[in-house]
Regions:
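Residue at a conserved register position within TPR or TPR-like alpha-solenoid repeats
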Residues: 93, 136, 174-176, 215, ...
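Alpha-solenoid helical repeat architecture
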Residues: 37-42, 77-86, 117-131, 158-172, ...
C-alpha cells in the first residue's frame, strides 16, 4: 500500500519515531485500517499532545501539532471505527479533559454498538454509561442531569467501583446538587499520594481543583488557594502548561489570586490557560480565564482591551455552542458598561441574555447571576429601592446553599443600594458585618470594586474617631488597605474615564453640572440658563448616568476628580 505522508511531517528528523507514527496513522486511516490507526494514534499523537513534546517536530511545534491533530481527528471522525476504539477515544479525551470530544465519542459508540456482537455491546455499554455519567457530572450544572448521572455512578460504586476518579466525580456531583450530607460522607482523596496513570492522575488534579472551588465558596480562601496551586503544579508536571486539565486548575487559581489582590503575573497565567481552552477546553475553564483577563484590564483602566477580551469570549462561545458562557460573557460586558455609565448598552446586553436557549432557564446559578445584573442596572438608573428588593430576594435564596462568597457579594451590593436609598442605618450595619466576614477570609476585590455609596462609607469609617464604637477596631487596617487599592485603581483609570465622560457630556450638561457645583437647585439652574425646570431635571439624570453616580454631591465630587469643573 502506498502511504501519502503529510508535508508537515517531512520536516521531522528521521530518528523521530512519533512523527513517523503520525504519518502511519494518517495512512492507515485513509486505508480504513481503523484498529491499526487507533493503536498508532495512542502511541504517538495523543502522547505528543498530552506531554506537549516539543522535540517531536522541528522548530516551534505548536502550529504543526495543531494542524496534525485537526487532520487526524477529521479523518478519524469520517471513518467508521469499532466500538472499542470509540470507547478508548472517549477515555483518552476524558484523561485530557476534552469533555465535548469525549461525549461525542460516547454518542458515536452507542450508534455503532447496535451493530456489534450483543454480549460485547452489553459489556461495553455498561462501561460507556459510567463514562458518560462521569463526563456529565464534570460538564453540566443542571440538577436533573447531574442527579441522573449520580445514580449511574452510585450503582457503580455499590458494585465495587472504588477508583479515585469515581470518588472525585461523586463528590463533585453531590456538591453541584447541594446534597451536602452525601458530599461529606464520601472520603476525600489523598492528593499527596503520587499517581501518574490515566484518570487516576486526572483525579488528583480535578479533585483538588473542585475542592478549591468549594473552599472558596465557604470563604476559606487560603485553603482554596493552596489546593488550587497544588493542583496547577501537578497538572503542569503531568500534562504541560497548555492543556485543558492545566487550564481548569489555572482558571480557579487565577480567580482566587485576583480576589485576594495578588494580581502580579496573572496575565501570563491566564493567557497560557486560554491557549489550551480555545482549541479543546471546557466552558468553565474558558469563562474563568476570560473573566479574570477582563477584570485585570478594567483594573488598570484599559477598558478597550477588556471589551476586546469579551468579544473573543462571545465568538468562542458561539463557535463551540456554549450558551452558558455566552450568557456569562454578556453579563460581564453589562457590568463593565455600567461602570462606564453606559446603562442603555448594558440593558441591551441583558436583553440579549434573555433570548438565549430556553434550557438556560433551568440553570439556577445562571438565573441568580442574571437577577444580580438586573439589580445592578436598576441601581445605576436611579431605581435603588427596586434593586434592593432583588438583592434581598437573592440573599434569602442563597441561605442554606453554603455559598458564603456569593452571599457576601450580594450583601455588599445590597448595602450600596440601601445607602443610596437613604437607609443609612441598615446599609451601614450590613456593610460592617460584610467587612468582618471579608477581613477574616482575606477578600479584597469584592470591596475594592463595590459601588460609590460603599466607597463613601468606607472612607467615612476610616476617618471615624477611635471612640466610634460602631466600627470594630480590628477592621481599621483592613479598610485602609481596601481604600489604598481603590485609590491606586482610581489613579490608573481616571485619565481614560475623564476623556470618555468629557466626550459624552453635551455642552448643556456641562453648564448644568457647573451650576450644580455652585449648589444651585434645579429651579435656580433653570432660571439662570433660561430653560424649563423639567429640562434641567432631564439633564441632571443624564449627568448621573454618564458619571455613574446617584447623588448630586457625588456627581460634583466625581466631576471635580475628573477635571470637568
Amino acid at each position: 500500500m502506498q502511504i501519502t505522508v503529510n508535508p508537515l511531517l517531512q520536516t521531522a528528523k528521521p530518528s523521530q519515531r512519533p512523527s513517523r507514527e503520525l504519518a502511519v496513522s494518517r495512512g492507515v486511516l485513509l486505508s480504513s485500517r481503523t484498529n491499526h490507526a487507533a493503536k498508532s494514534l495512542r502511541q504517538s499523537s495523543l502522547a505528543i499532545v498530552r506531554q506537549n513534546d516539543s522535540t517531536a517536530l522541528n522548530g516551534d511545534p505548536r502550529p504543526r501539532l495543531t494542524a496534525l491533530r485537526s487532520e487526524l481527528r477529521a479523518l478519524a471522525s469520517s471513518t467508521r471505527l469499532s466500538p472499542n476504539t470509540l470507547l478508548m477515544r472517549a477515555w483518552r479525551s476524558l484523561i485530557e479533559l476534552r469533555i465535548d470530544e469525549a461525549l461525542a465519542a460516547v454518542a458515536q459508540f452507542e450508534d455503532e454498538s447496535a451493530r456489534a456482537d450483543a454480549l460485547v455491546a452489553a459489556r461495553s455499554g455498561e462501561f460507556a454509561g459510567v463514562l458518560r455519567a462521569l463526563l456529565l457530572v464534570l460538564k453540566s450544572r443542571d440538577h436533573a442531569t447531574v442527579r441522573a448521572a449520580l445514580a449511574v455512578l452510585e450503582s457503580r460504586h455499590r458494585s465495587g467501583g472504588k477508583s479515585p476518579t469515581l470518588t472525585a466525580a461523586l463528590r463533585i456531583g453531590y456538591w453541584k446538587v447541594q446534597d451536602f450530607d452525601r458530599y461529606y460522607a464520601v472520603p476525600r482523596l489523598n492528593h499527596a499520594v503520587p499517581t501518574h496513570r490515566g484518570t487516576h492522575g486526572l483525579a488528583t488534579i480535578v479533585g483538588p481543583t473542585f475542592e478549591a472551588v468549594v473552599e472558596a465558596e465557604q470563604l476559606r480562601l487560603a485553603v482554596a488557594t493552596r489546593l488550587a496551586r497544588s493542583a496547577h503544579e501537578r497538572a503542569v508536571s503531568r500534562f504541560g502548561k497548555r492543556s485543558p486539565v492545566t487550564a481548569r486548575a489555572a482558571g480557579v487559581l487565577a480567580e482566587l489570586l485576583y480576589e485576594e489582590g495578588h494580581c502580579a503575573g496573572l496575565d501570563a497565567l491566564v493567557m497560557e490557560s486560554l491557549a489550551a481552552v480555545r482549541t479543546s477546553g471546557d466552558h468553565e475553564s474558558a469563562l474563568q480565564g476570560y473573566r479574570v483577563l477582563t477584570r485585570l484590564a478594567a483594573r488598570r483602566g484599559d477598558t478597550e482591551f477588556a471589551f476586546l477580551v469579551l468579544k473573543e469570549a462571545e465568538v468562542l462561545a458561539a463557535a463551540r455552542d456554549w450558551p452558558e458562557m455566552m450568557a456569562e460573557s454578556l453579563m460581564l460586558r453589562a457590568q463593565l458598561l455600567l461602570q462606564e455609565g453606559r446603562t442603555r448598552d448594558a440593558a441591551i446586553c441583558i436583553e440579549r441574555i434573555e433570548t438565549l436557549p430556553r434550557e438556560l432557564s433551568s440553570d439556577d446559578a445562571l438565573q441568580a447571576t442574571l437577577a444580580f445584573a438586573r439589580a445592578q442596572l436598576l441601581a445605576a438608573t436611579g431605581e435603588e429601592r427596586r434593586a434592593a428588593t432583588i438583592f434581598r430576594e437573592l440573599q434569602a435564596a442563597s441561605s442554606g446553599k453554603r455559598n458564603n462568597y456569593w452571599a457576601l457579594q450580594i450583601s455588599v451590593r445590597l448595602a450600596d443600594a440601601l445607602l443610596a436609598c437613604g437607609d443609612h442605618a441598615e446599609g451601614r450595619a450590613i456593610l460592617v458585618q460584610a467587612l468582618q466576614v471579608g477581613a477574616r477570609a482575606g477578600v479584597y476585590q469584592t470591596f475594592v470594586e463595590a459601588g460609590a455609596q460603599v466607597a463613601e462609607l468606607l472612607f467615612s469609617l476610616h476617618h471615624a474617631t477611635p471612640q466610634d464604637r460602631r466600627l470594630p477596631p480590628e477592621l481599621r487596617p483592613y479598610i485602609e488597605s481596601i481604600l489604598a487599592e481603590r485609590a491606586q485603581q482610581r489613579a490608573r483609570t481616571l485619565p481614560a474615564r475623564a476623556s470618555r465622560v468629557t466626550e459624552s457630556l453635551s455642552p448643556r450638561e456641562h453648564s448644568v453640572l457647573r451650576s450644580m457645583s455652585r449648589g444651585l437647585s434645579n429651579k435656580r439652574i433653570a432660571q439662570e440658563l433660561q430653560i424649563a425646570p423639567e429640562t434641567v431635571k432631564s439633564h441632571v439624570k443624564g449627568i448621573f448616568i454618564k458619571l455613574a453616580v446617584q447623588t448630586r454631591a457625588h456627581a460634583v465630587s466625581t466631576a471635580g476628580a475628573l477635571g470637568l469643573l
